[in-house]
Amino acid sequence: MEEHTPHGIGNHAVILTEPCGEIAEKIRAFLEDIGYVGFSNFDIKYDQRDGKYKVFEINCRQGRSNYYVTGAGYNIAKLLVEDRVEGKDLPFVLADNPSLWRVVPRKVAFRYIVSDYHQEMKDLMRQGREVRPLFYHKDRPLLRTLRMEKNLLGHFQKFKRYYQRKS
């Protein structure tokens, strides 16, 4: 699910990771063919009209939402240090562990994501397979905590105004 405010459109609000080996293999082959080395992510959409995934953008960087990779069990910072600092030869690994990444309140996620995904989301939360990159239990000074809570509450109004509810 993405944000839909005029300023935030295109930013991720919720990500459910799932294995997708066929697409990952095609993208890996493409990156190797062009000699690309480094972090990247691709914007991919599933087209229900023809049952195919459509790749429409590569982002040659890691951004806020890339923390979902850590949520799936692969710490990007650790891999970067092992590769560039320690000089380790790291094999290709497909991050195929399911996880839930979100920056919106739980109620907003459940209200605006189609109900087909609700049980999976609940299961991942119960299993501790949820990551919330804006909240870290050791980084809770009062002013920051208040700002983060205000930010969270603001999503209720933003989604109500700009996003059509899914059922």
Give names to the regions the model predicted.
Residues 48, 76-79, 101:
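Short, surface-exposed, charged/polar-biased interaction segments
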